[in-house]
Amino acid sequence: KIGPLTMLDIGGPGMMLAYGVGRIGCQMSGDGDWGIPNLSPKPHWLSWLPDWMWSFNFPHNVNMVDPDNRIPDCVGKFCYALKLPVYPTSFYESVVCLLLFLVLWQLRHKFKAPGVLFGIYMILNGIERFFIELIRVNTRYHLAGISFTQAEMISLILVIGGIGLISYA
């Protein structure tokens, strides 16, 4: 019989991998999971990267944002691009989550107590998402003088939950 915490440990690395692969779909479709406008020039030390990895206007995005910014000679439903290039946060998340999957994969045999690996997954996922939110477009909420997004709140809960799970294990 496999206990629930062991099952969570088994699933943690796979969940990080799935999240990273899923964000590739967000990048490809331009589903609105993008960052704030990025009008900064690409730093010289990143000059070897394709431009879309620094800022991207998501042509043919499925949200059809900026309807007056139609792509010339485009036929079909998804013929719009963002007026201003934005940070491609879904791409950034994909890269980071795939790297975090490799970290979790390396750690999978290091802990004997059930639940520790999943607790680490929760902490890493929460930290990753919190920092990506700093450059992502999302609705901000205000409570007791504190401004936050829904994802930032979920990130905080993930980190606290992960710490709690590791402490419990």
Residue ranges and their predicted role:
Residues K1-A169:
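A feature for loop-to-transmembrane-helix boundaries and adjacent hydrophobic helices
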